[in-house]
Amino acid sequence: MTDRVKSLQLLFDRPNEPLITPKGENGAIFQLTQDLLPVDYEDNGIALNNRFGEEADEKIPLKPLSNPPQFPIASQLPTDADFSLFLPRHQEMATEVIDVLMNIPENQLDDLLSSCVYARGRLNPQLFNYCYSVVLMHRRDTRNVPIQNFAETFPSKFLDSQAFAQARETAAVFPRGIPRTPIIIPRDYTATDLEEEHRLAYWREDIGINLHHWQWHLVYPFTASDRSIVAKDRRGELFFYMHQQIIARYNCERINNSLKRVKKFNNWREPIPEAYFPKLDSLTSSRGWPPRQANMTWQDLNRPVDGLNVTISDMERWRRNLEEAVSMGTVTLPDGSTRPLDIDTLGNMVEASILSPNRELYGSVHNNGHSFSAYVHDPSHRYLENFGVIADEATTMRDPFFYRWHAWVDDLFQKHKESNFVRPYSRSELENPGVQVTSVSVETQGSPQNVLSTFWMSSDVDLSRGLDFSNRGPVYARFTHLNHRPFRYVIKVNNSGNARRTTVRIFISPKFDERNLAWSLVDQRKMFIEMDRFVTPLKAGENTITRQSTESTFTIPFEQTFRDLSVQADDPRRVDLAAFNFCGCGWPQHMLVPKGTEAGAPYVFFVMLSNYDLDRIDEPGNSPEISCKEASSFCGLRDRKYPDKRAMGFPFDRPSRTATSIEDFILPNMALQDITIRLNNVVEANPRNPRT
């Protein structure tokens, strides 16, 4: 019997091609029946399918559907349109498809496969890919089906549009088995350094960073009829913390590039000075992504085709209601009653997810902000224009305005954390009696102690799985990205009490602000980026804790971003790569360390060993061995509580009651060490690139 896992995975292959053609590197053919044919091939599809099948080495039989699924809403999205979860109409479509596929009885994989084949042939390919990925991730019987790397199936969302004409030529001219020269993606293809924001293009346009954002929202969708798909443990708080860390990391990069911290978008009626020209084409719609000219302004949105009829006044009213909730420390429910406001509830209110306690009162400020920004060029659909990159989860982080918008969103969360209703931590919550950190350091092979080394690397990604209607065989695009030398943390601890467990929390932050002045803790606490968090045993007496940078619970392994590359021999998590689906939303390992500067950027390295009795999550059936540990701090754990009882970002998520600087904040169970991040401004070829 054909392996159903492999068959389900093949539905990701070449998403704009019909299933009557062979799929996968081995040219497998789905044996379509008349009821499963795409609409455009109902007259001659069987004959074409049979013709392709004559040369196929693998044939996949499909169970006929006596009652094919119906998609009255989702089928209204043209197959050549682009899809955005930020648009209310598209949310309705996605909800319909997810409902239908989730409701197919469990362990009826033949029925599921045929239904997915039917849906794939009738729905917009981007809509289907999103819904199909969510379904595979959330059905118990499909969790072992690998979700295809999105950059391989829809490469046009990540790479310069000029690359695809070259890619088709390469696929057409070079027979399979003949080495194919990679297509070089320029480092500066969206702007020049005349535009100061372009200094951050290496970061904003990084494939791994954009994949992170897309995958996180796949694991944490904000809408679905099945509430359990959305209502994961501490989901709203994780929405806050994941985006807060993005802003902190972005500000670190800005300071390293001699720029000020990002300015929040506070006045929603003022012009947006930042322009962005993405230089991307959609292979689905065969159109270029619309640019945004400098100094454009938000306009009231009236686009019935997208389900959008929202005014700036609506947004300002919802904003006032959110700010009132923060200032009062309470959330008002639809029946007029109130309850105390917490960070998890606020996260769901601001986004807003279906978990928002009062959507009518608090609106959907975050999501609509993306839509306002994406349609500044055509707010009323007068010109039949598509949305900009900021309205697509896979491209939104490319746009400089994403960070200005999220700086405002984060500021609202910080006001809650700084309010009188969120108590600063007491000493007893911060200390760990009997535990004293005596020294901390970072060690990088070939570098002095406490120096982290970054450099540029050129890596290849295979475009062929998304290169529809072209010959098979790998077609590589080579692009340049930031990377760093692997390093390790060395932490020496004296435990004067009994043997115990402790949570090690590791952060770094720039030592000085953009004016080269020492930080006040009220500002620096928002600049600390969490590098790792893990639980370790302490024996009585002296302990030395060593931890490899590749073990971080915030990141996914390097080769998970560049999926076709062979496993890194020094990555201790390589055996767990099959468990990528849920934990794959972590931060890319190659972007763990900020760029630094060639002269050496001064940073501070903070380590805290917190009291495990206050950190521990007691959960029935909890096992110390979890199959998927990668990025658990950013992604949580499947079907489990978030693996840390403390507030996300602890101990820097709240202002200090007494300390005015990070030096004042240090207790015996903490340590601070000056480190340097030095950029070696050269490009190294990835030794794991396929030979060409």
From Swiss-Prot:
Cofactor note: Binds 2 copper ions per subunit.
InterPro entries in UniProt: Di-copper_centre_dom_sf, Hemocyanin/hexamerin, Hemocyanin/hexamerin_mid_dom, Hemocyanin_C, Hemocyanin_C_sf, Hemocyanin_N, Hemocyanin_N_sf, Ig_E-set
Catalytic machinery residues: 351
Catalytic reaction list: L-tyrosine + O2 = L-dopaquinone + H2O; 2 L-dopa + O2 = 2 L-dopaquinone + 2 H2O
GO terms assigned for molecular function: metal ion binding; tyrosinase activity
Record localization: Secreted
Residues where Cu cation B binds: 366, 370, 406
First-listed, main subcellular location of the protein, grouped into a coarse class: secreted
Chain positions listed as propeptide in the UniProt record: 1-97
GO annotations of cellular component type: extracellular region
Named cofactor requirement(s): Cu(2+)
Known EC number: 1.14.18.1
Pfam families: Hemocyanin_C, Hemocyanin_M, Hemocyanin_N
Main EC class the enzyme belongs to: oxidoreductase
Biological process, per Gene Ontology: melanin metabolic process
Keywords: Copper, Disulfide bond, Glycoprotein, Metal-binding, Monooxygenase, Oxidoreductase, Secreted
Residues the entry annotates as binding Cu cation A: 213, 217, 243
Residues carrying sugar: 256, 295, 309, 494
SUPFAM superfamilies for the chain: Di-copper centre-containing domain, E set domains, Hemocyanin, N-terminal domain
Residue pairs linked by disulfide bridges in the UniProt entry: 583-628, 585-635
Top-level taxon in the UniProt lineage: Eukaryota
Record note on quaternary structure: Heterodimer.
Job of this protein: Copper-containing oxidase that functions in the formation of pigments such as melanins and other polyphenolic compounds. Catalyzes the rate-limiting conversions of tyrosine to DOPA, DOPA to DOPA-quinone and possibly 5,6 dihydroxyindole to indole-5'6 quinone. Binds to the surface of hemocytes and is involved in hemocyte melanization. Binds the A.niger cell wall component alpha-1,3-glucan, a fungal pathogen-associated molecular pattern (PAMP) that activates the host immune response.
Family according to the record: Belongs to the tyrosinase family.
Name by which UniProt lists this protein: Phenoloxidase subunit 2
Organism of derivation: Galleria mellonella
